[in-house]
Amino acid sequence: MRQFLDVGTGLPTADNTHEVAQRVAPDSRIVYVDNDPIVLAHASALLTSTPEGRTAYLDADLYDPEAVLKAAAGTLDLSRPVGLMILNTLGHVAEYDRARELVRRLMAGLPAGSHLVISDSTATSEGMIAASEAYNASGAVPYYVRPVAEIAGFFDGLELVEPGVVRVPEWRPGPSDGVEAAAAVDAYCGVGRKP
């Protein structure tokens, strides 16, 4: 995989998608998508590329998948596989069916061999449910936690990559990742390949 579409990227931090991808393959192309003006300001300053690759930022909205794909085609070759990343973003879409439809429309514009990566907080503990309710009552942009089965439903029609839909720290853990950390995380993730 040499092309990545990171939808709902949020504020740049350490080891952003382009840094990790271009460290492994300097010719990788990455497109970040968000609609937050604060993210845009930081992205413009911090998201640079290797000379061999390309990194771009789109001021675009998850709710318009076709416009996202059209704009991304300025940097990515959409006739070749793309890694679509939607990390901790779908929780902002209140209606589950609408969230699934947005994912389906994005994947429909990508060729066979593309991969979908999703992670989101889940309604797997009373503490997380209470925290979500308090956050949503605060006036912030709401974030809805979902059952694990709904996270898994985003991958319908795709070939799940092992180990499937699991808690984030359990997805290919490194030698220093402990079971204790996994037990404390109310976020699940998965990777699916478009056949």
For the regions a language model picked out, list residue spans one by one.
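Conserved class I S-adenosyl-L-methionine
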Residues: 1-12
